[in-house]
Amino acid sequence: MIYAMYGVLEDIENGKLYLNVNEIVYEIVVGDTGYFEDFLNEKIKVFTKMIVNDDEISLYGFSDVLKLKLFEKLILVNKLGPKSALKIITSSDVSYIVSAIVNEDVKTLSTLPGIGPKTAERIILELKDSMKEFDVTLTEKDKKILEAIEALVTLGFSRNQSKKAVTQILKKDDSLDDIIKKALKFLSR
């Protein structure tokens, strides 16, 4: 299997990266191209998972190893394919997803795209015990940050814009409401 690839990012189109590795250009499916857009025509490392189906071979790509590991766990869940798993990972932060699974939070998981209550319950049932390797413990501050990002994404901002805004304006003692208000002001500039 191909764990990671290092090459020049030649193009980004329709949720796919085109990575030139030693004069061979690979098509890599990614859920959110936003992270990679800053690296066009530069050398980058993409963590990958190769999926072989009856009719195609696909490479799925991730910006970091935690996203790859979570993807590998999610595709093991009964009736959850790689496209659904990718949608889940790109819709939220890894720590937010893992925390919801560990805490058996069906409601939070159900807010992710393509996940209803039954699928959320199945994910929790099948993955709860295997989430220990992620060692995710969210502080109250982390929870506020993630909730603020989720709120901004719900309002139509991209995940990358939302993360950038929240990290720029974050103060130690801000309430969730204050964080969201300040982030909205930051984003409306």
Swiss-Prot record:
Q: Summarize the protein's role.
A: The RuvA-RuvB-RuvC complex processes Holliday junction (HJ) DNA during genetic recombination and DNA repair, while the RuvA-RuvB complex plays an important role in the rescue of blocked DNA replication forks via replication fork reversal (RFR). RuvA specifically binds to HJ cruciform DNA, conferring on it an open structure. The RuvB hexamer acts as an ATP-dependent pump, pulling dsDNA into and through the RuvAB complex. HJ branch migration allows RuvC to scan DNA until it finds its consensus sequence, where it cleaves and resolves the cruciform DNA.
This entry's Gene Ontology molecular function terms read: ATP binding; four-way junction DNA binding; four-way junction helicase activity
Q: Which gene encodes it?
A: ruvA
| UniProt protein name | Holliday junction branch migration complex subunit RuvA
Q: Which CDD domains match?
A: UBA_RuvA_C
What are its GO cellular component terms? cytoplasm; Holliday junction helicase complex; Holliday junction resolvase complex
Task: Establish whether keyword DNA damage is in the entry.
Answer: yes
Q: What species is given as this protein's source?
A: Thermosipho melanesiensis (strain DSM 12029 / CIP 104789 / BI429)
Q: Which UniProt keywords apply?
A: Cytoplasm, DNA damage, DNA recombination, DNA repair, DNA-binding
> What is said about the domains?
Has three domains with a flexible linker between the domains II and III and assumes an 'L' shape. Domain III is highly mobile and contacts RuvB.
Biological process annotations from GO: DNA recombination; DNA repair
